[in-house]
Regions:
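Active-site region of glycoside hydrolase catalytic domains
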Residues: 1-177
Protein backbone atom coordinates (compact mmCIF):
# COMPACT_ATOMS: atom_id res chain seq x y z
CA UNK A 1 0.00 0.00 0.00
CA UNK A 2 1.05 3.65 -0.02
CA UNK A 3 2.56 3.22 3.45
CA UNK A 4 4.97 0.61 2.13
CA UNK A 5 3.46 -2.41 3.86
CA UNK A 6 0.82 -5.10 3.49
CA UNK A 7 -2.19 -4.10 5.59
CA UNK A 8 -3.45 -6.75 8.02
CA UNK A 9 -6.84 -7.35 6.38
CA UNK A 10 -5.41 -7.49 2.87
CA UNK A 11 -2.53 -9.74 3.99
CA UNK A 12 -4.97 -12.19 5.57
CA UNK A 13 -7.14 -12.12 2.43
CA UNK A 14 -4.12 -13.08 0.31
CA UNK A 15 -2.97 -15.74 2.78
CA UNK A 16 -6.43 -17.36 3.02
CA UNK A 17 -6.39 -17.90 -0.74
CA UNK A 18 -2.76 -18.92 -1.04
CA UNK A 19 -2.00 -15.75 -3.02
CA UNK A 20 0.51 -14.09 -0.69
CA UNK A 21 3.70 -13.38 -2.63
CA UNK A 22 6.89 -15.04 -1.49
CA UNK A 23 8.77 -12.24 0.25
CA UNK A 24 12.53 -12.19 0.40
CA UNK A 25 14.70 -10.40 2.90
CA UNK A 26 14.67 -6.72 2.11
CA UNK A 27 11.37 -6.73 0.17
CA UNK A 28 9.36 -4.98 2.89
CA UNK A 29 12.14 -2.45 3.47
CA UNK A 30 12.13 -1.76 -0.27
CA UNK A 31 8.37 -1.16 -0.17
CA UNK A 32 8.75 1.28 2.73
CA UNK A 33 11.56 3.19 0.99
CA UNK A 34 9.72 3.55 -2.34
CA UNK A 35 6.32 5.01 -1.65
CA UNK A 36 4.19 6.59 -4.40
CA UNK A 37 4.03 10.33 -5.07
CA UNK A 38 0.35 10.23 -6.07
CA UNK A 39 -2.58 7.84 -6.48
CA UNK A 40 -3.98 7.21 -9.95
CA UNK A 41 -7.25 5.35 -10.43
CA UNK A 42 -10.01 4.63 -12.94
CA UNK A 43 -13.61 5.39 -11.97
CA UNK A 44 -16.59 4.51 -14.13
CA UNK A 45 -19.33 3.46 -11.73
CA UNK A 46 -20.14 2.52 -8.19
CA UNK A 47 -21.21 -0.95 -7.13
CA UNK A 48 -23.66 -1.87 -4.41
CA UNK A 49 -23.09 -5.14 -2.62
CA UNK A 50 -24.77 -7.51 -0.20
CA UNK A 51 -23.35 -10.23 2.01
CA UNK A 52 -22.56 -13.52 0.27
CA UNK A 53 -22.11 -16.12 3.02
CA UNK A 54 -19.92 -19.17 2.75
CA UNK A 55 -21.70 -22.51 2.40
CA UNK A 56 -21.03 -26.06 1.25
CA UNK A 57 -21.68 -24.81 -2.29
CA UNK A 58 -19.89 -21.45 -1.98
CA UNK A 59 -16.38 -21.91 -0.59
CA UNK A 60 -13.71 -19.33 0.20
CA UNK A 61 -12.07 -18.10 -2.96
CA UNK A 62 -15.03 -19.01 -5.22
CA UNK A 63 -15.55 -16.07 -7.57
CA UNK A 64 -17.78 -15.08 -10.44
CA UNK A 65 -15.95 -12.77 -12.82
CA UNK A 66 -17.64 -11.10 -15.75
CA UNK A 67 -15.74 -8.06 -17.05
CA UNK A 68 -14.99 -7.34 -13.39
CA UNK A 69 -15.50 -9.53 -10.30
CA UNK A 70 -19.23 -9.78 -9.51
CA UNK A 71 -19.15 -11.91 -6.37
CA UNK A 72 -16.82 -13.72 -4.03
CA UNK A 73 -18.04 -16.34 -1.57
CA UNK A 74 -17.70 -15.23 2.04
CA UNK A 75 -17.23 -11.61 1.03
CA UNK A 76 -19.78 -9.94 -1.26
CA UNK A 77 -22.24 -10.17 -4.13
CA UNK A 78 -22.92 -7.22 -6.47
CA UNK A 79 -26.55 -6.09 -6.44
CA UNK A 80 -28.36 -3.44 -8.49
CA UNK A 81 -28.86 -0.03 -6.90
CA UNK A 82 -32.41 0.89 -7.92
CA UNK A 83 -31.71 4.58 -7.19
CA UNK A 84 -29.13 4.99 -9.97
CA UNK A 85 -29.41 5.08 -13.74
CA UNK A 86 -27.06 2.80 -15.67
CA UNK A 87 -25.20 2.82 -18.97
CA UNK A 88 -26.02 0.39 -21.78
CA UNK A 89 -23.33 -1.86 -20.25
CA UNK A 90 -25.17 -1.86 -16.89
CA UNK A 91 -22.61 0.34 -15.15
CA UNK A 92 -24.39 2.48 -12.57
CA UNK A 93 -23.85 6.23 -13.03
CA UNK A 94 -22.80 7.71 -9.70
CA UNK A 95 -20.99 11.05 -9.67
CA UNK A 96 -21.51 11.33 -5.90
CA UNK A 97 -19.63 8.03 -5.62
CA UNK A 98 -16.67 9.58 -7.44
CA UNK A 99 -16.64 12.51 -5.04
CA UNK A 100 -16.77 10.12 -2.09
CA UNK A 101 -13.90 7.98 -3.40
CA UNK A 102 -11.77 11.08 -3.96
CA UNK A 103 -12.45 12.38 -0.46
CA UNK A 104 -11.80 8.96 1.11
CA UNK A 105 -8.50 8.47 -0.72
CA UNK A 106 -7.35 11.99 0.18
CA UNK A 107 -8.31 11.67 3.86
CA UNK A 108 -6.69 8.26 4.17
CA UNK A 109 -3.43 8.79 2.26
CA UNK A 110 -2.89 12.55 1.79
CA UNK A 111 -1.49 12.00 -1.69
CA UNK A 112 -2.55 13.98 -4.78
CA UNK A 113 -4.99 12.13 -7.04
CA UNK A 114 -5.05 11.52 -10.77
CA UNK A 115 -8.22 10.16 -12.31
CA UNK A 116 -6.73 8.11 -15.13
CA UNK A 117 -10.04 7.10 -16.72
CA UNK A 118 -13.61 8.27 -16.20
CA UNK A 119 -15.22 7.67 -19.56
CA UNK A 120 -18.73 6.78 -20.59
CA UNK A 121 -19.14 3.77 -22.85
CA UNK A 122 -22.00 3.85 -25.29
CA UNK A 123 -23.02 2.37 -28.63
CA UNK A 124 -23.00 5.22 -31.08
CA UNK A 125 -24.48 4.98 -34.54
CA UNK A 126 -23.64 7.69 -37.06
CA UNK A 127 -26.94 9.10 -38.31
CA UNK A 128 -27.36 10.18 -41.91
CA UNK A 129 -27.07 13.85 -40.97
CA UNK A 130 -23.55 13.08 -39.67
CA UNK A 131 -23.76 14.20 -36.03
CA UNK A 132 -24.07 11.88 -33.05
CA UNK A 133 -26.40 13.22 -30.37
CA UNK A 134 -24.24 12.51 -27.33
CA UNK A 135 -26.32 14.11 -24.58
CA UNK A 136 -25.93 11.16 -22.17
CA UNK A 137 -22.11 11.27 -22.36
CA UNK A 138 -22.08 15.08 -22.03
CA UNK A 139 -24.29 14.86 -18.92
CA UNK A 140 -22.15 12.05 -17.43
CA UNK A 141 -18.90 13.97 -17.90
CA UNK A 142 -20.42 17.23 -16.69
CA UNK A 143 -21.71 15.62 -13.49
CA UNK A 144 -18.43 13.80 -12.83
CA UNK A 145 -16.33 16.94 -13.41
CA UNK A 146 -18.59 18.79 -10.95
CA UNK A 147 -17.92 15.98 -8.45
CA UNK A 148 -14.17 16.54 -8.87
CA UNK A 149 -14.72 20.28 -8.36
CA UNK A 150 -16.69 19.62 -5.15
CA UNK A 151 -13.86 17.42 -3.88
CA UNK A 152 -11.33 20.14 -4.73
CA UNK A 153 -13.45 22.70 -2.87
CA UNK A 154 -13.00 20.73 0.37
CA UNK A 155 -9.24 20.40 -0.08
CA UNK A 156 -8.66 17.25 -2.14
CA UNK A 157 -5.57 17.74 -4.34
CA UNK A 158 -5.58 16.56 -7.95
CA UNK A 159 -2.77 16.42 -10.48
CA UNK A 160 -4.93 15.36 -13.41
CA UNK A 161 -8.17 14.10 -14.90
CA UNK A 162 -8.32 11.91 -18.01
CA UNK A 163 -11.54 10.96 -19.73
CA UNK A 164 -9.86 7.93 -21.36
CA UNK A 165 -6.31 6.64 -21.29
CA UNK A 166 -4.40 5.70 -24.43
CA UNK A 167 -5.49 2.05 -23.97
CA UNK A 168 -9.23 1.75 -23.35
CA UNK A 169 -10.03 -1.27 -21.17
CA UNK A 170 -13.56 -1.52 -22.60
CA UNK A 171 -12.34 -1.77 -26.20
CA UNK A 172 -10.69 -5.10 -25.46
CA UNK A 173 -14.02 -6.32 -24.10
CA UNK A 174 -16.42 -5.03 -26.72
CA UNK A 175 -14.21 -4.38 -29.72
CA UNK A 176 -14.72 -1.76 -32.37
CA UNK A 177 -17.47 -1.57 -34.93
Amino acid sequence: NVKGEYGGVFKRYLEDRGWMPMLQEGDLACLKENKPDFIGFNYYASKSISAYPLSDKNKIGDMVIKLLPAEEAGIYKVVKNENLNATLWGWEIDDIGLEGVCRLLWERYRLPLMITENGFGNKEVMPEEGMIQDDDRIDYLHRHLLAVKRAMNVGVEFIGYCNWSFMDIVSGHSGFS
